[in-house]
């Protein structure tokens, strides 16, 4: 009888732990995710976490993004980032600075692929946040760059946001004075895009 009660209590405790667990999401990108030019309370990580928590989700968003980071920079620091315990999802959003600097899409793809492989080796799910190149480096470059993210998503069966700045890029009302980095309203739009995908992924995870 005592043993039976003990087992029941143990099961209840485990259920309570699971029910109260906080999902941990790491944003791993560049200035577009880091919150460049904005006060801390307006950073994407804060806005996204507040929006999800306001809807009742137990979630922690960690800002693992670095302004100015290229895919090579991300590759150099991914091992350190993955030391964070109990990561439930890593959102990979690098490549914009590669594109702005005209770095070969072949190199960018190779770096992102290594980041994906290293993250996968830790059994951490990945959400890939893509970028699109303008035509300033030529149509051939744009075509090659734009194929990076769909190709990686297909190869590694990753959920994909085709364009992180969907509805924000090239719209002055959603960007800071430089015309590149989202302002608060733009950050809210990016956050809503990520929020929808995060909710979908965690619902699938719990089924």
Question: What feature does the model see in each segment?
Answer:
Residues 34, 70, 135:
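Flexible, glycine-rich phosphate/dinucleotide-binding loops
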Residues 8-16:
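Bacterial N-terminal signal peptides
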Residues 20-67, 77-86:
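Serine-esterase "nucleophile elbow" of acetyl-processing enzymes
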Residues 37, 62-70, 99-103, 179:
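Acidic/histidine-rich helix-loop elements
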Residues 75-207:
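Alpha-helical cap/lid subdomain in secreted, periplasmic
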Residues 9, 71-75:
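Short gly/ser/thr-rich secondary-structure transition/capping motifs
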Residues 1-9:
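Bacterial N-terminal signal peptides that target proteins for export
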Residues 15, 55-57, 120, 154:
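Short, structurally constrained coil/turn elements
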């Amino acid at each position: 009888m005592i043993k039976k009660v003990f087992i029941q209590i143990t099961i209840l405790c485990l259920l309570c732990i699971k029910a109260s667990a906080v999902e941990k999401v790491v944003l791993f990108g560049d200035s577009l995710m880091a919150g460049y030019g904005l006060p801390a309370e307006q950073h994407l990580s804060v806005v996204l976490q507040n929006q999800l928590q306001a809807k009742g989700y137990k979630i922690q968003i960690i800002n693992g993004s670095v302004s100015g980071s290229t895919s090579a920079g991300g590759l150099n620091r991914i091992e350190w980032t993955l030391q964070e315990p109990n990561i439930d999802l890593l959102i990979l959003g690098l490549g914009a600075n590669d594109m702005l600097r005209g770095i070969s899409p072949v190199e960018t793809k190779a770096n992102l692929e290594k980041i994906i492989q290293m993250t996968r080796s830790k059994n951490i799910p990945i959400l890939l946040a893509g970028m699109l190149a303008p035509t300033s480096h030529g149509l051939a470059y744009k075509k090659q760059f734009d194929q990076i993210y769909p190709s990686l998503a297909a190869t590694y069966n990753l959920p994909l946001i085709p364009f992180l700045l969907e509805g924000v890029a090239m719209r002055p009302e959603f960007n800071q004075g430089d015309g590149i980095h989202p302002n608060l309203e733009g950050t809210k739009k990016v956050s809503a895009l990520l929020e929808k995908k995060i909710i979908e992924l965690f619902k699938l995870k719990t089924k």
